[in-house]
Amino acid sequence: TSKDDLSPVLGGYWPGIQIYYPPIKFNPLDGTYETMEQAKFRLQKHAYKTKAHTLLFDLEDGCRMKEMSRKLLLEELPKFPERDFQIALRVNPFRTKEYEEDLTLIKQIHKHIDVIVLAKAGEVYGDAEIRDLSSWLVSIGSKVTIQPIIEHPKSLKIADKLMSHSTVKHVVFGIHDF
């Protein structure tokens, strides 16, 4: 109900329960990765019907099959049925080759995602990482927000700067990083 609306206190929509979803899954029993068809089937079976508030697709260090994962997301995210949860993409660290490839994907699918999760935010280039990504999102006409992950004391020291950008609504603290 409207009287229970906590968005003014929480800074808007709260990401709530975020389910980590590897686009291409590894099967440790036989040491292989899913095929594209298996990954599509799993996505349609489980991701379409998630009860989580945010479905987080990882392209960063938890993702070994990056090119195939990007291809899967490019093909499948536009097919998602109407949903009542957010879709987030965890991208690779700022100014890396993989980050640039992630941006190429985002340019094509930004209308189908809600949040970019920036791993290791601010560790190398400070708040310029958020500033540049924010500017880039504006340049492509995107309404996607940024959720920085603070994983290092250096980033914690500049958390106020990371959060000062209008595209940042929430930050994540890496619980194993401190």
Protein language model regions, located:
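Conserved alpha/beta-domain cores
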Residues: 4, 9-178
